[in-house]
């Protein structure tokens, strides 16, 4: 599943194709994705101008002008799931694919939603597994919607700090890795970047969340921010399932210190340890037991 850096990369790729432009036609080829699409989905979007695209955790938020004068903005919430893929076809017919396809082709069979923009741009959403979803929410109700209400702070936002993280870890007996994957703790973190952040902070994934003292929390907060910023700058991580909206592969996976490196020597100078893989909550955890305490 794409994590925060990959979703942010897709948002940045879609923004030039959508922002400031009106949707002139929506093709809806099935009534549902992971969940049923909203009632009158295509009709409610047709004719609306896109104001801006934002990201919250692993969701892309498309803000649209009000349907009626004086009304509230509607927000299209999009989640890519495991296999969602956007492809942007320019007015000239050129294509800039934004892939989340696990190495499988899209093709019209899996092209479920098509947005035609006023300048001739066509944005196609394909999803062969249909684990992604879309929803429409009035802007005043966005923060309290079922998708966003329980989310923790954005790790790259001003509301995220060592003090905030320490408060959210207080009294929790779960392993620190499990606590960080809980979207109520910090929004948008996934398996890859939690492994990498814990490594940079020198914290064992087996340590209980409540045992992370102030100095470690400071290091962890800084490591989370740094790992995410580095990954976004690299265009995300290409494993089997990701390329950016311009078709370029993300390359942060080449900078992985521990993820996917079981049995390799720790890259930290003077450590001498070996990267180990364990399973926590049915997910692979990669860490160096010699320098992560």
Swiss-Prot record:
Gene3D superfamilies: 1.10.8.50, MutM-like, N-terminal. DNA binds at residues 110, 129, 172. It catalyses: Hydrolysis of DNA containing ring-opened 7-methylguanine residues, releasing 2,6-diamino-4-hydroxy-5-(N-methyl)formamidopyrimidine; 2'-deoxyribonucleotide-(2'-deoxyribose 5'-phosphate)-2'-deoxyribonucleotide-DNA = a 3'-end 2'-deoxyribonucleotide-(2,3-dehydro-2,3-deoxyribose 5'-phosphate)-DNA + a 5'-end 5'-phospho-2'-deoxyribonucleoside-DNA + H(+). GO terms for molecular function: 8-oxo-7,8-dihydroguanine DNA N-glycosylase activity; class I DNA-(apurinic or apyrimidinic site) endonuclease activity; damaged DNA binding; zinc ion binding. A zinc finger (FPG-type) spans 257-293. Binds 1 zinc ion per subunit. SMART domains: Fapy_DNA_glyco, H2TH. InterPro entries: DNA_glyclase/AP_lyase_DNA-bd, DNA_glyclase_Znf_dom_DNA_BS, Formamido-pyr_DNA_Glyclase, FPG_cat, MutM-like_N-ter, Ribosomal_uS13-like_H2TH, Znf_DNA_glyclase/AP_lyase, Znf_FPG/IleRS. Its cofactor is Zn(2+). Its EC number is 3.2.2.23, 4.2.99.18. Keywords: DNA damage, DNA repair, DNA-binding, Glycosidase, Hydrolase, Lyase, Metal-binding, Multifunctional enzyme, Zinc, Zinc-finger. The active site is at 2 (schiff-base intermediate with dna), 3 (proton donor), 58 (proton donor), 283 (proton donor). The keyword DNA repair applies. It holds the Pfam family Fapy_DNA_glyco. Belongs to the FPG family. Monomer. Involved in base excision repair of DNA damaged by oxidation or by mutagenic agents. Acts as a DNA glycosylase that recognizes and removes damaged bases. Has a preference for oxidized purines, such as 7,8-dihydro-8-oxoguanine (8-oxoG). Has AP (apurinic/apyrimidinic) lyase activity and introduces nicks in the DNA strand. Cleaves the DNA backbone by beta-delta elimination to generate a single-strand break at the site of the removed base with both 3'- and 5'-phosphates. This is Formamidopyrimidine-DNA glycosylase.
